Each structure stands twice: as C-alpha cells, then as structure tokens.
Amino acid sequence: MNEKNVYNAIADVYERFSDSAPQIEVEIRTVFGLAGEIQGKSVLDLACGYGLFSRLYKSRGASKVVGADISTNMIEIARNKSRQYGDGIEFHVRDVCNMESLGKFDIINASWLFCNAISLEELEMMFRTVANNLAPSGKLIAYTIEPDYQLTKGNCSNYLCDILSEEHCRGGLLFKAEFTFPSRNPPLPPAPFTMYSWSREQHAEASHKAGLQIEWHKPMLSQSDIDNQPAGFWDTYQNNCHEAAFVCKFL
C-alpha cells in the first residue's frame, strides 16, 4: 500500500462505503452547516475522491467547482461521473502537498485530506496550498480525524470503519484501519487504509505558518440520526468520536 496514496487501491469500493456508512450524512450536514451560503461561490475540493462533495457543492449552486486528488483511480471515477451528469466540474490529479495555485476560491473543501499528512512537514505544506488557493475573504472547511480520539476508549465498527491499531509515529499517531461492508451481498473484503492524527496544537501551528487561523467544530449529529438507529448505536460516536471538523480563514 502506497503510504501517500492509500485510496488508489480501494477507489472502486470507497463509494460503497460512502453510500452505506451512517455517519456520512452527519459529515455532509456538518460541512455545509459550516460552509454557509454556496450560491454563486467558487469551490476547490481537495482530496475530492470520486467527487461526492464536488457534486454536492455544484448542486447547491456553486458557480465553479474544481476537484483535486492524488489518486488517479479516484479522479477517473470522478471524471466519468462528471461526463455522465454533464455538471462541468473540473477534476485534476494532484498531490496537494506540491500543488500549484488553481485560482483563488471562495471555499476550499478538504474532507479527509489532513489525516493523510504523513509528517508535520506535509501538514504545513497542505496548509500552504490552501493559503495559495484561497480568496482573501474565503474559508477552508475541513473534516478529519478527531485529535482526541483514542482507540482504547472505543472502536468505530458501528460506522463501518474498523480501527486495527494505534501507534506513535513522527510526532503524531498512526492509525491502521479498514472500511468494512458487513451488509453487502455478496460480501466484500475489508478495504485497508491509514490515517495520521495530529494534535490541535500542531494543526494550529501549521495553519498559522500559512497565515491562517483555525477553529474546531464537532460533527453535527442530529436527534433524528439518533432516533433512526438502535439504542446505544451512537454512544462511541458521541463519547469518543473519531471525526472532527475545522474552519480556517486568513489571519
């Protein structure tokens, strides 16, 4: 598994995870709750994958949407869908750590980008790329692993994400995990991936070096989410959540 491109090998099944995982709706609600008004805005979707958020921004009225991802397989899927829907979204294969400016965007979306920084240097590089592509009054909406999450306090198996191990690595934490598909018929084998967790202080320092200030937010779990699942289903998500969001603007 390529350390920097873990999703290339599982691109064909990742959409099935997104279609099945109950917390995806929470993620979508959180991202757009923080994004605010979309109509007429330009959007850059970093770590866009197969284009889920790119298309959601476009359907909510964004005037221009550009997606970028390191995975050639993900971008191929995204482009095929864009041709199918005729939505005019641009998709590019890019390593965000070494990406040129594609313009100045009102909103930069980064769902599950920063947890792919394999070092503090890469974390800083990602924030610099954001700063180089963000309009002066724009904002970054990011979704990533919760810095306070601890495997010893509960796994995420209810949410189709089985975390196998947690270890110290390069000043942060490395989580080895699998997407699972227990309800698929015929069943699919687990899809392995990794995440790197950096502290709030490390995020703050890296973003500040790029001229950005950071504000953390919890996922917007609703009462209807709770009511639609068996009792206790969301307990780990509420008490030891593995997900978090943050917003960045220029200082």
Where are these regions (language model features)?
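C-terminal lobe and adjacent flexible extensions of AdoMet/dcAdoMet transferase-like proteins
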Residues: Q202, A206-L251
